[in-house]
Structure formats: C-alpha cells, structure tokens
Amino acid sequence: MKLRRQLCIIDIINQKEVATQEELCETLKNQGFDVTQATVSRDIKELKLIKVADKDGYHYALPDTPGVKGSFERMKRVIEDSVLGLDYSENLIIIKTLPGSAHAVASLIDSAEWPTIIGTVAGDDTILAVVKPKEAAPGIVEEFEQLMLKSNR
C-alpha cells in the first residue's frame, strides 16, 4: 500500500500544484486511500519532496536530484514490463518474471525497503520474497498486482 500511495503522490504532484499536506491528503482520500496527515507527512519526507515558489505561493515538487522520482517510476515500469504473475503461501511470495528479469526486479524490491519484506532470493525468472509478519503477504501481493497494471504512458 505504501509504495502504491507514494507512486500516486508523485503522479498527483506532477499533474497539479499541491500547496499543503491537507490538500494532498484530501486528494489521496478521493482516490481511495485511507490516509492521515501524519502518513502524508512521512511520505513527503521519504520522497524528499520540496516546496517551490509559484505565482500563488508554494507547492510540492520532486527534487531535481536523481533517484527520487526516477526510482519509483523505474520500479513501476520494470514491474509492469517484467512481472508475469505472483502467488503466496503463509509468509512466502513467489514472483514470476520474464526470463532474465528476476534479479533486476528483486534488486528494486530490496532497494524499496519495504518494512514487511525481510528479503528476496532471485533465480532467472522467479523471485522468492520473505514477508514478516505473514499477515502482510496478501497486502503486498495486492500492491504488486496494482503495480503490474499498465499505466497510460
């Protein structure tokens, strides 16, 4: 959920000028996210969003530093293009990828630092992700399924 929410935040601030955390919170709620101002504040900090001046005051933007915007967009693109399917049992998630893609996808998962994914092991076309606690597995699978949906690029 966190990754999907943060990807949505990036989309929102790329599409319109958002001046306050409250405005961002309301926009996320309108898109189906159950968020609080504190959650949005943490996301802003993790995404390293900055406030830039505009004609009406200030609005949130991604920093020009490489890595922040690109890493989320890259992860979404790689997952859209490489992940074929996934399944889980207990605290283990199996992610099927195109041949040769598993290492790249596993590396992106590891770099995203999901607090509930404690590690990944990648073969040529299969990734094993270990989740803790096991109750988090269905939510992570749901996030991946959302990321697998092709966007309108």
UniProtKB/Swiss-Prot annotation:
What does the UniProt entry say about where the protein is found? Answer: Cytoplasm
Q: What does this protein do?
A: Regulates arginine biosynthesis genes.
Q: Which family does it belong to?
A: Belongs to the ArgR family.
Species this protein is from: Syntrophomonas wolfei subsp. wolfei (strain DSM 2245B / Goettingen)
> Does the entry feature the keyword Ligase, yes or no?
no
| One Pfam family hit | Arg_repressor
Per its record, how is this protein called by name? Answer: Arginine repressor
The Gene Ontology CC terms held by the record are: cytoplasm
GO terms (molecular function) for this protein are: arginine binding; DNA binding; DNA-binding transcription factor activity
- Highest taxon of the source? Bacteria
Q: Which SUPFAM superfamilies does the record match to this protein?
A: C-terminal domain of arginine repressor (SSF55252), Winged helix' DNA-binding domain (SSF46785)
What UniProt keywords apply to this chain's record, in alphabetical order?
Amino-acid biosynthesis, Arginine biosynthesis, Cytoplasm, DNA-binding, Repressor, Transcription, Transcription regulation
Task: Identify the pathway.
Answer: Amino-acid biosynthesis; L-arginine biosynthesis [regulation]
Give one GO biological process term. protein complex oligomerization
Task: Please name the InterPro entries in this protein's record.
Answer: Arg_repress (IPR001669), Arg_repress_C (IPR020899), Arg_repress_C_sf (IPR036251), Arg_repress_DNA-bd (IPR020900), WH-like_DNA-bd_sf (IPR036388), WH_DNA-bd_sf (IPR036390)
